């Protein structure tokens, strides 16, 4: 671990650490330094593993190119094995994700206490947007649509209008 550092150098570092940090803070400092070293080693190992994986993929890809150039009939067993591994990796990547069906996940109607409505009606109501609902039922109208509303302020006061707020009408 300490290739270039001998026993005397380690002893000198320990004494200097004891003098600078003191006996209370030295164990905490040693623990934090060792945790940093462990984290660095873990990071280096993960990078190393990723590089090895990438190199293996590159090797498999190169073997596949060789197999294509030679033809698939007269291949060595090593190339056939690498082709099979590559095919399996491609199939695992291309495998579609399985989506859970919300209808299958709902409890059976006899187990439901709060809702006498069937589960198909509930799911159709949940997954329908207002635009889709209006397209599905064109006869349905919205009560307060802005296009059919009358103007908010009348241009002329009506005969039964309240005259208390209008000073000209009072006088």
From Swiss-Prot:
Q: Which segments cross the bilayer?
A: 2-22
Q: Which InterPro entries match?
A: TatA/B/E, TatB
Name where it's found. Cell inner membrane
Q: Which UniProt keywords apply?
A: Cell inner membrane, Cell membrane, Membrane, Protein transport, Translocation, Transmembrane, Transmembrane helix, Transport
RNA-binding as a keyword?
A: no
Please list the GO terms describing molecular function: protein transmembrane transporter activity
Residues covered by region (Disordered) = 69-171
Q: Where is the composition biased (Polar residues)?
A: 88-97, 160-171
- Keyword Acyltransferase among record annotations: no
Q: Where is the composition biased (Low complexity)?
A: 114-130, 138-158
Entry GO terms, CC: TAT protein transport complex
What topology in the membrane does the UniProt record assign?
Single-pass membrane protein
Pfam families in UniProt: TatA_B_E
GO biological process: any one? Answer: protein transport by the Tat complex
Q: How does it assemble?
A: The Tat system comprises two distinct complexes: a TatABC complex, containing multiple copies of TatA, TatB and TatC subunits, and a separate TatA complex, containing only TatA subunits. Substrates initially bind to the TatABC complex, which probably triggers association of the separate TatA complex to form the active translocon.
Q: Which family does it belong to?
A: Belongs to the TatB family.
Q: Briefly state the protein's biological role.
A: Part of the twin-arginine translocation (Tat) system that transports large folded proteins containing a characteristic twin-arginine motif in their signal peptide across membranes. Together with TatC, TatB is part of a receptor directly interacting with Tat signal peptides. TatB may form an oligomeric binding site that transiently accommodates folded Tat precursor proteins before their translocation.
Q: What is this protein called?
A: Sec-independent protein translocase protein TatB
Specify the species.
Answer: Shewanella baltica (strain OS185)
| Gene responsible for this protein | tatB
């Amino acid at each position: 671990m300490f290739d270039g550092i001998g026993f005397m150098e380690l002893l000198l570092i320990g004494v200097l650490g004891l003098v600078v940090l003191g006996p209370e803070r030295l164990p905490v400092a040693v623990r934090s330094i060792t945790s940093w070293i462990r984290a660095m080693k873990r990071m280096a190992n993960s990078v190393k593993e990723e590089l090895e994986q990438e190199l293996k993929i590159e090797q498999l890809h190169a073997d596949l190119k060789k197999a294509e150039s030679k033809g698939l009939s007269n291949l060595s067993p090593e190339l056939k094995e690498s082709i099979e591994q590559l095919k399996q990796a491609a199939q695992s990547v291309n495998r579609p994700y399985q989506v859970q069906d919300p209808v299958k996940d709902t409890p059976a109607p006899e187990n439901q206490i709060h809702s006498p409505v069937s589960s198909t009606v509930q799911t159709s109501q949940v997954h329908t947007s207002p635009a889709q609902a209006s397209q599905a039922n064109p006869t349905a109208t919205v009560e307060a649509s802005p296009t059919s509303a009358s103007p908010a302020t009348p241009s002329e006061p009506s005969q039964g209008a309240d005259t208390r707020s209008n000073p000209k009408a009072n006088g």
